[in-house]
């Protein structure tokens, strides 16, 4: 579900998963690991 997907992103990034559909695959914009 969309909630489970958001929870997965939250666990991966340790920060708020919004907008999770935009940040997915490119965390560099959020200062992340740049997948």
Curated annotation (Swiss-Prot):
Recorded catalytic reaction(s): these are: a 1,2-diacyl-sn-glycero-3-phosphocholine + H2O = a 1-acyl-sn-glycero-3-phosphocholine + a fatty acid + H(+)
Which GO cellular component does the record give, naming just one?
Answer: extracellular region
- InterPro entries referenced in this protein's UniProt entry, alphabetically: PLipase_A2, PLipase_A2_dom, PLipase_A2_dom_sf
Q: Which GO terms describe its molecular function?
A: calcium ion binding; phospholipase A2 activity; toxin activity
Q: Which residues participate in Ca(2+) binding?
A: 27, 29, 31
Database matches in SUPFAM superfamilies: Phospholipase A2, PLA2
Q: Which UniProt keywords apply?
A: Blood coagulation cascade inhibiting toxin, Calcium, Disulfide bond, Hemostasis impairing toxin, Hydrolase, Lipid degradation, Lipid metabolism, Metal-binding, Myotoxin, Secreted, Toxin
UniProt cofactor note: Binds 1 Ca(2+) ion.
Q: How is it modified after translation?
A: Contains 7 disulfide bonds.
Q: Which GO terms describe its biological process?
A: arachidonate secretion; lipid catabolic process; phospholipid metabolic process
Please explain the role this protein plays, according to its UniProt record: Snake venom phospholipase A2 (PLA2). In vitro, shows anticoagulant activity and induces cytotoxicity when tested on C2C12 myoblasts/myotubes. In vivo, when tested on mice, induces myotoxicity (intramuscular injection), edema (injection in the subplantar region) and lethality. The catalytic and anticoagulant activities of BnpTX-II are lower than those of BnpTX-I. PLA2 catalyzes the calcium-dependent hydrolysis of the 2-acyl groups in 3-sn-phosphoglycerides.
Subunit info here reads: Dimer.
Q: What else is known?
A: Has a pI of approximately 7.8 and about 121 amino acids.
Q: Which family does it belong to?
A: Belongs to the phospholipase A2 family. Group II subfamily. D49 sub-subfamily.
What protein name applies here? Basic phospholipase A2 BnpTX-2
Which organism is this entry from? Bothrops pauloensis (Neuwied's lancehead)
